[in-house]
Amino acid sequence: MFSANTIHSVFSLFKTDVFSKEVDRFNFGGIFEHLIFNPFEAQIDTGNMMQALLKKAHQNDILILNSQTVTSFQELNNDVEVVTNGITFKTNKLLYTTNGFASQLTNNQVKPARAQVLITKPIPNLDIKGTFHLDKGYFYFRNINDRILFGGGRNLDFEGETTTSHDTTELIQNRLEELLKTVILPHQEFEIEHRWSGTMGVGTHKKPIVEQLSNNVYCGVRMGGMGVAIGSLVGQELADLV
């Protein structure tokens, strides 16, 4: 539940009611009659977002090296020597933005949190439009055109999901399918087309870590599962710090 102070702060920011009680018109199964509606939550096409980011990087003569794993780095006076699985190079400044992969760099202030996901094949006459959260936010689903993207379930196995492995597990994937059948699409047939996972960066605090770690090394990590929403802001703060 939100405290009265939190609700007041949100109202002060948006100058209108952020949450309202709405009747469930989607015919979800096994839930309360009403949903909590937030008109300010939106969808983003992350594919288009990354295309725009790559285009902006190219326009600013920024070189992107793919499939490179940083194995070590060493500060050398005014430079930083970076060693990857493929090459070694020097740079004036090193900025870490690897989020869930930054545990060692931040003395375990950031822990990896795997997020498992699935997406259905196209569903004829799909009526569900929007973004949705359930079970304290541990599950999230949205439509992508006429498909349902559904992810979450980390609370079923916190220890097992504290990993940088990109595997999926039967425990969580089976639960996602079960909720699809019983809650989200109780009256429709569907098929799963893809399953995958990603890595978030979480910690004991929600506030991101934007810090100078040494003379020439900086980090912007611990997005707390909100990387898409706040990543660009954290990037700007990190750039300003340098």
List each model region and its residues.
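Flavin (FAD/FMN) cofactor-binding and adjacent substrate-gating region
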Residues: M1-A52
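General small-molecule cofactor/ligand-binding pocket signal
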Residues: K15-K21, L63-L65, E191-R195
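Helical element adjacent to the flavin cofactor pocket in flavoenzyme catalytic cores
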Residues: I31-N92
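Flavin-dependent oxidoreductases
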Residues: S72-L149
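Short glycine-/acidic-enriched loop or helix-start segments at secondary-structure transitions
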Residues: L105-N107, G160-E161, I230
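Flavin-binding catalytic cores
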Residues: P124-L126, T162-S197
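Amphipathic alpha-helix from the class-I
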Residues: G153-T163
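C-terminal catalytic lobe of FAD-dependent flavoproteins
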Residues: P186-V242
